[in-house]
Amino acid sequence: YALTFEPAVFVYHKPSFTKEKPPSTRAEFVDYLKRHGSAVFGKIGTYDIERSGVGFLFMARDQEQFGDIWSVIQAMGAAGVKLYSTSSAILERVSDGRFVLGYNILGSYAADWAARHPDVGIVLPRDYTVVMSRIGLVPQAAATPDLGRRYLEFFMSKEGQTIMARELQIPAVSPDVAGANTANTMREMLGGQLKPVPVSPGLMVYLDQVKRARL
């Protein structure tokens, strides 16, 4: 089951953007890096796709959605991009100004960090926004499959999804749940801009080692 609805976002250091808006598309992201050159060298962060599963997933979806994604990668490389395996490592550096931008950061972590660190801003890319879902399943060999089934049923219920959205600050996927931190609201705001990763056996493609090596 898909339990959440979490976008990949740009994050930025608000005090670094008092004279211009932060980039809101990948083309604007590339343009910003080229225009600012040495001023932002070493101040861009994203996931290390060799060590971060979510980073690899987001980059693989970028390759499918955006024909010119390698221009983004080249621009970040020229800007001395720093690579990390965790969201918190990037967000910490954006919040204190060591980084001006973070690319493809998991939105739920970014939102939690921004709520506690007012200098962190978030942009849902206007060209397209990749969305991933956390998956829940009960293994065939589970010792207590009924308990696992009840656990998933609760988190898929209106009550469970509401707790997830309001208390855990993780966007709820259920259409029965309303509010700011839900798939319903994101779809109303962004419509076709959202590009969810389909929850299907096709997800196994992203575990294929040949595909990972090619990317």
Predicted regions and their residues:
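Extracytoplasmic ligand-binding site segments that recognize negatively charged/polar headgroups
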Residues: 1-95
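Periplasmic-binding protein-like
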Residues: 6, 36-40, 72-77, 83, 88, 154-178, ...
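A bilobed periplasmic-binding-protein/Venus flytrap-type ligand-binding module shared by bacterial periplasmic
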Residues: 9-16, 58-60, 133-144, 163
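Short amphipathic alpha-helical coupling segments at ligand-binding clamshell hinges
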Residues: 68, 72, 134, 143-155, ...
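Hydrophobic residues within well-ordered alpha-helices
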Residues: 94-97, 138
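A ligand-binding cleft/hinge motif common to bilobed small-molecule-binding domains
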Residues: 100-119
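An extracytoplasmic/periplasmic, membrane-proximal ligand-sensing/linker region
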Residues: 172-215
